[in-house]
Amino acid sequence: MGTNSAGFALMNTQSYNLVDVKGDEERGAANGRVIYRALEVCATVEDFCHFLDTISKPSDIEANFGVIDAQGGAAMFEVDYYKYAMYDANNPKDAPYGYIARTNFSFAGKVNEGAGYVRYMEADQVLMKASATGSITPQFIFNDLSRSFRNRMLDIDLRSGAYNRPQASGWFVDQDFIPRSSTSCSVVVQGVKPGEKAELTTMWTLLGYPPTGIAVPLWVKDAGKLLPGMVRFGKEHEAAPLSDWSLRLADRVFSYKQGMGTGRYLNWERLYSPEKGDGYMTAITAAEDEVFRTTKSLLEEWYKKGSLDTQAIPKLYDELESSIRMIYQSLLESE
């Protein structure tokens, strides 16, 4: 996933019901390469249509691609080796409630095959209400989707408190929640309206396991010089610092490793503890709230001016990185 200097943004989820794979064939082998190339050559949703029309077939793609551009375009593409189905978010027939959601199955694929149906139920219900009330924002998506622990099939929400001590053990099984133990990031691209400069497109980026990660704003303009160290891969870490800190906390959450399959057990009490107020998510979301507050005032100024202030970005990054580092140091040293 990513965005480019034209304000074109692209994300994908692996679909599991569009292609009948054979033997040891890798599903969606070209999915990542397609994103990389499309960000190089596309500026609009229409460009992406042309891109899909003209790439060689079979394409080795099996994915749902979400696309937005700086001209007001927004669409979802379900793509297999030879064809694609497009769903226009500006067309009430395709998006009657103003949004399109996907997990790991495609509407154009085989019925009841694929993955992520229970997660889709949760995303759809959350987005429907938020769309009706005009409350879909980047911060909302991180808090209410990326950190959702509601399972619609079981009709439970771990955040209700009923699964914490003393009512329960404080442990639960990681099954069909939107954030999974394998989730490596959460990204929200905040696009621009027609007439606004594409450089104002903001890619809110959370690296690592979303319930233990903190989102930060990134911009394409001068990114080669300005991108903060906390999102850059470093030799001293196996990942960028933001990802490393998040995953170290996640390792404590998924800490039961006594035999096969036990990695699915979630130390919910450590992640969220409403009685004591000291779970990781409480500290993480408070820190992220401050990131959004700090960035909001600058974004408002830049939108009024009509362009980014690249002189102010390094100072913002230094301030954010300093405060985020302190939060993680405190959490990592607490046990």
Regions found by a protein language model. Give the residues of each.
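C-terminal, well-structured catalytic/ligand-binding subdomain of enzymes
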Residues: 1-3, 8, 12-40, 63, ...
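Short arginine-rich
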Residues: 57-63
